[in-house]
C-alpha cells in the first residue's frame, strides 16, 4: 500500500548558499506527486517538508541522504506523520 504521508526532514551540513533548496525542489518535481517546501533555518540547516505518496517521500529522503546533493550533507533527521494537505506545489521558502 502506498498511502499518502508527510515527511519532515532537517538537513545538516554545508547546505545553505549552495543551491540546496533549488535542487531539492527540482528533485521533488522530478519524483512527481509531492507538495511542500524547502526552507533555510537560522541555525544553518535546511528544513524539507514533503507530502504525497510514501514511495515518493522515501525517494526524496533517499536523495537527501545520498551523495548527489549540492554542498555537503552531514546528517538528516526525519519525522513521518499524516499529511495536512495544506501545500500547493513544492516551494522554496
Swiss-Prot record:
Catalytic reaction annotation: an acyl phosphate + H2O = a carboxylate + phosphate + H(+)
Active site: 21, 40
SUPFAM superfamilies assigned to the protein according to its UniProt record, in alphabetical order: Acylphosphatase/BLUF domain-like
Annotated InterPro entries: Acylphosphatase, Acylphosphatase-like_dom, Acylphosphatase-like_dom_sf, Acylphosphatase_CS
Pfam family, one: Acylphosphatase
GO molecular-function terms, A-Z: acylphosphatase activity
EC number assigned by the record: 3.6.1.7
Segments forming domain Acylphosphatase-like: 6-93
Keyword vocabulary terms for this entry: Hydrolase
Enzyme class name: hydrolase
Family (UniProt): Belongs to the acylphosphatase family.
Name this protein carries in UniProt: Acylphosphatase
